[in-house]
From Swiss-Prot:
PROSITE patterns: PHOSPHAGEN_KINASE, PHOSPHAGEN_KINASE_C, PHOSPHAGEN_KINASE_N. One of its GO terms (cellular component) is extracellular space. This is Arginine kinase Lit v 2. ATP binds at residues 122-126, 185, 229, 280-284, 309-314. Its EC number is 2.7.3.3. Signal peptide: none annotated. It catalyses: L-arginine + ATP = N(omega)-phospho-L-arginine + ADP + H(+). Catalyzes the reversible transfer of high energy ATP gamma-phosphate group to L-arginine. It comes from Penaeus vannamei. The keyword Transferase applies. Induction: By LPS immunostimulation. In hemocytes, expression increases sharply at 3 hours, decreases slightly at 6 hours, increases significantly again at 24 hours and decreases at 48 hours after LPS injection. In muscle, expressed less than the control in the first 6 hours, then the expression increases strikingly from 6 to 24 hours and decreases at 48 hours after LPS injection. It comes from the Eukaryota. One of its GO terms (biological process) is phosphocreatine biosynthetic process.
Length: 356
C-alpha cells in the first residue's frame, strides 16, 4: 500500500492534470478518476507506486505520452493505465493481443536502400533491453547500477571479430575521451527534463558507460534510458549490413545476460513506446523536394508507418534539410517485419523524391 505522503502528491498531480485543458498527453487522456482511484494506493514489490509512473507527465504537461514503468511489475500492476496507452500509441495492438516471439527473419533479404548514395547519409538500427532481476531507473540503487555495469562490461569485452571494442565508463572519464566520444556523436548526456522528472538520472554517472567497436559501427549504451541500448550504424544506406551486425550482437549478448521479457508485451523497456521488438530502424536522409513541406512529408511517411524527426532526434529541427526517419511500429509485429516496414517505406520515399 502506498503511503499517505505519496497519495497526497498523487491527488495533487491528478488535480493538476485535470485542470490542464491544453494538455494532450496520453496520460491525461487515459488517467480517468476511476482508473486513478483504482491504482493510487497500489505498490509493486520493489516499492514503486503510481507516482513513479506518472510524475514525468504531471511535471511536463507537454509530454506526448507522459508515463514510464519504474519496474517490470508495473506493466502488470498498473495495467489499467498502461494497456490503453500502449494500445493507443502502438496503433492496432489491442489489449487482447499478444506480441509475437522474437524473429529476426532472413537477415540476408535486406538491401542497400540507396546504392547511388544520393539521399541517405547514414543508417542505424537499435534495440533496447532490460536485464532480468533488476528494476528500471527510478528504483535502482547505486550499487545495482555498478553491479549491472560490471556484468555488461565483462560480457561486451568478450565480443570478437567485428564487434570487438572498448568499454568507456562515464565515471572518471577523462576530458580527452569525453571529447572524442562527443565528436563521434556517441556520448549520451544526462537525461532531458522528461527523464529527469521520471527519476531516471539518479546517482549519475554511476554505472553508466559506452562501448564501441574499433570501426565505430557498433555501440552499446549502458544504463542510459534503458539498461542496454544496442546500436548498429554506418554511413550510407546499407540496411542489410547494419541489421546483420545488430542481430549477431544481440544473439551474442543474450547468451550471457538474461533479458526481461513479458508474454504479452515482448521485451520490456522503461518507456512504453519502445516495448515489443524495441527496434528502431532509422536513416538520416535528404529529400529536398518532399521535405519542402514538412507536414506533407509527415503525411506521406505516416502512410508507410514511418516517423519523422529532426536531425538530432526527438524534439529537434532538421539541420540542412536532413531528417531522421524511422519505423513507428514496434509492437504486434516481429523484428523482421518492423525493419522491413522501414525499408519498404524509405524505398518508396526515395522513389517519390526522384519522380518529383
Amino acid at each position: 500500500m502506498a503511503d499517505a505522503a505519496v497519495i497526497e502528491k498523487l491527488e495533487a498531480g491528478f488535480k493538476k492534470l485535470e485542470a490542464a485543458t491544453d494538455c494532450k498527453s496520453l496520460l491525461k487522456k487515459y488517467l480517468t478518476k476511476e482508473v486513478f482511484d483504482k491504482l493510487k494506493d497500489k505498490k509493486t514489490s520493489l516499492g514503486a507506486t503510481l507516482l513513479d509512473v506518472i510524475q514525468s507527465g504531471v511535471e511536463n504537461l507537454d509530454s506526448g505520452v507522459g508515463i514510464y514503468a519504474p519496474d517490470a511489475e508495473a506493466y502488470t500492476l498498473f495495467a489499467p493505465l498502461f494497456d490503453p496507452i500502449i494500445e493507443d500509441y502502438h496503433v492496432g495492438f489491442k489489449q487482447t493481443d499478444k506480441h509475437p516471439n522474437k524473429d529476426f527473419g532472413d537477415v540476408n533479404s535486406f538491401v542497400n536502400v540507396d546504392p547511388e548514395g544520393k539521399f541517405v547519409i547514414s543508417t542505424r538500427v537499435r534495440c533496447g533491453r532490460s536485464m532480468q532481476g533488476y528494476p528500471f531507473n527510478p528504483c535502482l540503487t547505486e550499487s545495482q547500477y555498478k553491479e549491472m555495469e560490471a556484468k555488461v562490461s565483462s560480457t561486451l569485452s568478450s565480443l570478437e571479430g567485428e564487434l570487438k571494442g572498448t568499454y568507456y565508463p562515464l565515471t572518471g572519464m577523462s576530458k580527452e575521451v569525453q571529447q572524442k566520444l562527443i565528436d563521434d556523436h556517441f556520448l549520451f548526456k544526462e537525461g532531458d527534463r522528461f527523464l529527469q522528472a521520471a527519476n531516471a538520472c539518479r546517482y549519475w554517472p554511476a554505472g553508466r558507460g559506452i562501448y564501441h567497436n574499433d570501426n565505430k559501427t557498433f555501440l552499446v549504451w549502458v544504463n542510459e534510458e534503458d539498461h542496454l541500448r544496442i546500436i548498429s550504424m554506418q554511413m550510407g544506406g546499407d540496411l542489410g549490413q547494419v541489421f546483420r551486425r545488430l542481430t549477431s550482437a544481440v544473439n551474442e549478448i543474450e547468451k550471457r545476460i538474461p533479458f526481461s521479457h513479458h508474454d504479452r508485451l515482448g521485451f520490456l523497456t522503461f518507456c512504453p513506446t519502445n516495448l515489443g521488438t524495441t527496434v528502431r530502424a532509422s536513416v538520416h536522409i535528404k529529400l529536398p523536394k518532399l521535405a519542402a513541406n514538412r507536414e506533407k512529408l509527415e503525411e506521406v511517411a505516416g502512410k508507410y508507418n514511418l516517423q519523422v524527426r529532426g536531425t538530432r532526434g526527438e524534439h529537434t529541427e532538421a539541420e540542412g534539410g536532413i531528417y531522421d526517419i524511422s519505423n513507428k511500429r514496434r509492437m504486434g509485429l516481429t523484428e523482421f517485419q518492423a525493419v522491413k516496414e522501414m525499408q519498404d517505406g524509405i524505398l518508396e520515399l526515395i522513389k517519390m523524391e526522384k519522380e518529383m
